[in-house]
């Protein structure tokens, strides 16, 4: 899949949000944390990821083009919060109480762990699996782990193992 060209205005909106939220956090925390590097190379169904050691935020350009305002309002602060928590508290649970506090009390953004974006444009081949209550779509990676006997997956609703259809 070809990566879309991101409009300059969108990149500027992302950078403006990042800088505003970082300044807000630095003021509230009494710190001077540096600006993280922004990279538009996240792939797959993740909207973004925070890379702690390299202090960078990777954003999915395909999902960003399709959900521009949500990226600015939610995804950028979400990933920034991970980096700030790591700088402020060290290594803690990814979406634990420190992250929730950073999102809500410091950045002023609702703490949601996952996005609700439409994924059709970024979804790769999936394999149908079934439990007792519904059908599931496993990614190629998960399907191959099942085939090799390296993993089994269970339904989060009924708890039953998933079986290939």
Swiss-Prot record:
An annotated GO BP: response to stress
Organism name: Enterobacter sp. (strain 638)
Cofactor(s) this protein cannot do without: Zn(2+)
Gene Ontology molecular-function annotations: zinc ion binding
Full protein name: Protein SprT
GO CC entries: cytoplasm
Chain's gene name: sprT
InterPro entries: SprT-like_domain (IPR006640), SprT_Zn_ribbon (IPR035240), Uncharacterised_SprT (IPR023483)
Compartment annotation: Cytoplasm
Cofactor binding note: Binds 1 zinc ion.
HAMAP family in the cross-refs: SprT
Binding site for Zn(2+): 78, 82
Active site positions: 79
Family, as annotated: Belongs to the SprT family.
Residue span, SprT-like domain: 19-163
Database matches in PANTHER family: PROTEIN SPRT
Annotated SMART domains: SprT (SM00731)
Keywords: Cytoplasm, Metal-binding, Zinc
Gene3D superfamilies for this protein: Metalloproteases ('zincins'), catalytic domain
Signal sequence annotation: none
């Amino acid at each position: 899949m070809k990566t879309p060209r991101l409009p300059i205005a969108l990149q500027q909106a992302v950078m403006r949000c990042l800088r505003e939220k970082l300044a807000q956090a630095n003021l509230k925390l009494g710190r001077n944390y540096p600006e993280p590097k922004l990279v538009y190379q996240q792939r797959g169904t993740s909207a973004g990821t925070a890379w702690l050691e390299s202090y960078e935020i990777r954003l999915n350009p395909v999902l960003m083009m399709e959900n521009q305002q949500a990226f600015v309002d939610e995804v950028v602060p979400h990933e920034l919060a991970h980096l700030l928590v790591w700088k402020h508290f060290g290594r803690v649970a990814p979406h634990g109480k420190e992250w929730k506090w950073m999102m809500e009390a410091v950045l002023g953004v609702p703490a949601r762990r996952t996005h609700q974006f439409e994924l059709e444009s970024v979804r790769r081949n999936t394999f149908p699996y079934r439990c007792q209550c519904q059908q599931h779509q496993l990614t190629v990676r998960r399907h191959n782990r099942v085939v090799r006997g390296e993993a089994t997956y269970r339904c989060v609703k009924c708890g039953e193992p998933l079986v290939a259809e």
